[in-house]
Amino acid sequence: MKQALRVAFGFLMLWAAVLHAEVRIEITQGVDSARPIGVVPFKWAGPGAAPEDIGGIVAADLRNSGKFNPLDRSRLPQQPATAQEVQPTAWSALGIDAVVVGQVTPNPDGSYNIAYQLVDTGGAPGTVLAQNSYKVNKQWLRYAGHTASDEVFEKLTGIKGAFRTRIAYVVQTNGGQFPYELRVSDYDGYNQFVVHRSPQPLMSPAWSPDGSKLAYVTFESGRSALVIQTLANGSVRQVASFPRHNGAPAFSPDGTKLAFALSKTGSLNLYVMDLASGQIRQITDGRSNNTEPTWFPDSQTLAFTSDQAGRPQVYKMNINGGAAQRITWEGSQNQDADVSSDGKFMVMVSSNNGQQHIAKQDLVTGGVQVLSSTFLDETPSLAPNGTMVIYSSSQGMGSVLNLVSTDGRFKARLPATDGQVKSPAWSPYL
């Protein structure tokens, strides 16, 4: 927890730009079929009202995962604060085999103790599956709640939780001197802040694997430029500003390289920069357009979009040489892929019969599953644990963010109130 707090502390440097118009998750499909679970409001052991609803945060996280359906508070058979107070039969009668209980206690120094227990209602009374406690200051209460959610989620699913992650996205506001903003928020839309404001378009944010930097495209110099911004202090490093197009940045998983697309020689081609030396080398060539790189886990292989066969399709290629291999064959065109951290599957924008949706392709079997059902879907980005995809779609006259689980069952929107939202990028674990 202490290490995680140190990693996240850099974001506080930018909180002076926190905005009141935030995005919030609105679930549209899939919770009813998820596993039921009990999450009891955490007992507040101080005067007045609790400073944060930790139990509510845990319940929302588990619901947002698409894998759990927390029992509505009005239906809770009891409100225990400890495992010893849980009456297993009261919960099992409702089909619930796991209950989260906890307490929030204020300390004299202004900090708070957060404690939780995950209780098995199918075992002997008081059987604890997982438990932990944290001492945090007020500004880290939500983070502590997400930490508890991560631990509960992993214990029950065997999958690492991703509730302490963030998303970056571009917002085009309605006028003003700087109508384009690159923003970052918690995965659930809370704690939103502005990373960069610009009078010109901003595009294609991409996270470094340690979560400390964002690469993105800016047009402030009068032409496109690729930059890397350090979130803790706001410092900006220009990576590429060649004639024509500079775009589609992607950090390698080992953090040593940045792949991107340039059209300085005519067609779009892929290049890779060694971030330590600044040396750039060309990876693809020819007359076809090659863009939208995404890395495989080995940090040596790229998947990318190419029109070498006519329409855009996804190919893969080792950056040290060899021929590109086409890996998408279903649909009229496929593009803008994001490979999972284990390299077993990818998500992409797939077009067929005039429809443009987010699809998942198994990289072992080649099987394809369409995940989304929204309109003109684009720019999919995977959560680091591979369970969820965030993407943008058209709605009305604007663009909004959406979530869909990688099994296609859970769907949600993240509507914003102050502009069009696009180009989402899900952070690594923080």
Curated annotation (Swiss-Prot):
GO terms for biological process: cell division; protein import. Its main location: periplasm. It comes from the Bacteria. Residues 1-21 form the signal peptide. The keyword Iron does not apply. Keywords: Cell cycle, Cell division, Periplasm, Signal. GO terms for cellular component: periplasmic space. The keyword Cell division applies. It is found in: Periplasm. The Tol-Pal system is composed of five core proteins: the inner membrane proteins TolA, TolQ and TolR, the periplasmic protein TolB and the outer membrane protein Pal. They form a network linking the inner and outer membranes and the peptidoglycan layer. HAMAP family: TolB. Part of the Tol-Pal system, which plays a role in outer membrane invagination during cell division and is important for maintaining outer membrane integrity. TolB occupies a key intermediary position in the Tol-Pal system because it communicates directly with both membrane-embedded components, Pal in the outer membrane and TolA in the inner membrane. Belongs to the TolB family. This is Tol-Pal system protein TolB. It comes from Salmonella choleraesuis (strain SC-B67). The gene is tolB.
